[in-house]
């Protein structure tokens, strides 16, 4: 099945669609979302990170947020987040209305294989203490709960361990969670 992305302008208005790989080859601005699930523990917050599968066409074997993708045409980002949590890691218990939408940011990055990310990326978070998962090996090779301290340590020591968008997503999530407390 051919996948399409929604092309947007700098203000976030939809201006068309394009096949996903072509949009990444041309570096055109398109709609995306990043989901980051977290839980409260006695030692503080933990974040559920996925390691992208070896077979992904970019950012393979990189740690990233819980899931990320592109909404389909006429699909809101919260519904898309719920859909992709199920498709990538088998999580079915998070409903669209459980997400807190932190808004969007635009980033552009050249990737390791000549492709380019240029995304208007919505950040969705949810507090999910009890989730179980079944990994889709075409999407994810590992999934782990990470503490804030472990993420900070790894970001400082080995930033290339993570996808190019993850540090921005993580920083915006932390800012929101620290302001909310």
From Swiss-Prot:
**Superkingdom of the organism of origin:** Bacteria
| Annotated active site | 68, 119
- Look up keyword Cytoplasm and say if it applies: yes
Residues annotated as binding Mg(2+): 88
Residues annotated as binding Mn(2+)? 24, 30, 70, 117, 119
Q: Which PANTHER family match?
A: ISOPENTENYL-DIPHOSPHATE DELTA-ISOMERASE
Which protein family is it in?
Answer: Belongs to the IPP isomerase type 1 family.
Q: What is this protein called?
A: Isopentenyl-diphosphate Delta-isomerase
To which species is this protein native?
Aliivibrio fischeri (strain MJ11)
Q: Which gene encodes it?
A: idi
């Amino acid at each position: 099945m051919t996948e399409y992305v929604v092309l947007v302008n700098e203000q976030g208005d939809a201006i068309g669609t394009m096949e996903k790989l072509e949009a990444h080859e041309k570096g055109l601005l398109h709609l995306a979302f990043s989901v980051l699930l977290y839980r409260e523990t006695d030692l503080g917050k933990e974040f559920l990170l996925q390691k992208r599968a070896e077979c992904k066409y970019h950012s393979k074997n990189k740690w990233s947020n819980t899931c990320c993708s592109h909404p389909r045409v006429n699909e809101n980002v919260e519904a898309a987040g719920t859909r992709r949590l199920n498709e990538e890691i088998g999580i079915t218990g998070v409903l669209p209305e459980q997400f807190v939408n932190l808004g969007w940011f635009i980033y552009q990055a050249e990737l390791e294989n000549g492709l380019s990310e240029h995304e208007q990326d919505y950040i969705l978070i949810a507090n999910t203490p009890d989730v179980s998962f079944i990994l889709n090996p075409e999407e994810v090779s590992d999934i782990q709960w990470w503490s804030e301290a472990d993420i900070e340590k790894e970001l400082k020591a080995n930033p290339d361990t993570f996808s190019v968008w993850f540090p921005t997503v993580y920083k915006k999530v932390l800012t929101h969670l620290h302001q909310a407390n």
